[in-house]
């Protein structure tokens, strides 16, 4: 009995909740402007790519 009422409550909550739908609406960043997206992605992936090279440079200069 309790399980049925809990299940009914959760399904009614899910049905009542609504969020914006569409491409790019479920992402934590905006994809509306392609140039800012390009800059953000280049900084994100470029920094991750350059970290090993910077570590090696630091180790070589340290000796």
Swiss-Prot record:
Gene Ontology cellular-component terms listed: mitochondrial inner membrane; respiratory chain complex IV
CDD domains: Cyt_c_Oxidase_VIIc
Topology versus the membrane: Single-pass membrane protein
Boundaries of the annotated transit peptide in chain numbering: 1-16
Residues bearing the modification N6-succinyllysine: 25
Residues in coiled coil: none
Any one of the GO BP annotations: mitochondrial electron transport, cytochrome c to oxygen
Annotated TM spans: 34-60
Major site of localization recorded for this protein: mitochondrion
Protein localization: Mitochondrion inner membrane
Residue ranges annotated as Mitochondrial intermembrane topological domain: 61-63
PTM-bearing positions, type N6-acetyllysine: 25
Annotated metabolic or biological route of this protein: Energy metabolism; oxidative phosphorylation
Stretches assigned to the Mitochondrial matrix side: 17-33
SUPFAM superfamilies: Mitochondrial cytochrome c oxidase subunit VIIc (aka VIIIa)
UniProt KW keywords: Acetylation, Membrane, Mitochondrion, Mitochondrion inner membrane, Transit peptide, Transmembrane, Transmembrane helix
Similarity remark: Belongs to the cytochrome c oxidase VIIc family.
Function: Component of the cytochrome c oxidase, the last enzyme in the mitochondrial electron transport chain which drives oxidative phosphorylation. The respiratory chain contains 3 multisubunit complexes succinate dehydrogenase (complex II, CII), ubiquinol-cytochrome c oxidoreductase (cytochrome b-c1 complex, complex III, CIII) and cytochrome c oxidase (complex IV, CIV), that cooperate to transfer electrons derived from NADH and succinate to molecular oxygen, creating an electrochemical gradient over the inner membrane that drives transmembrane transport and the ATP synthase.
Complex and partners: Component of the cytochrome c oxidase (complex IV, CIV), a multisubunit enzyme composed of 14 subunits. The complex is composed of a catalytic core of 3 subunits MT-CO1, MT-CO2 and MT-CO3, encoded in the mitochondrial DNA, and 11 supernumerary subunits COX4I, COX5A, COX5B, COX6A, COX6B, COX6C, COX7A, COX7B, COX7C, COX8 and NDUFA4, which are encoded in the nuclear genome.
PANTHER family documented for this protein: CYTOCHROME C OXIDASE SUBUNIT 7C, MITOCHONDRIAL, CYTOCHROME C OXIDASE SUBUNIT VIIC
UniProt protein name: Cytochrome c oxidase subunit 7C, mitochondrial
Originating gene: COX7C
């Amino acid at each position: 009995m309790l399980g049925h009422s809990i299940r009914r409550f959760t399904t009614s909550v899910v049905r009542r909740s609504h969020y914006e739908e569409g491409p790019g609406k479920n992402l934590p960043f905006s994809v509306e402007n392609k140039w800012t997206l390009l800059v953000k992605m280049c900084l994100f992936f470029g920094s991750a790519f350059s970290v090993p090279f910077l570590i090696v440079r630091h180790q070589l200069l340290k000796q």
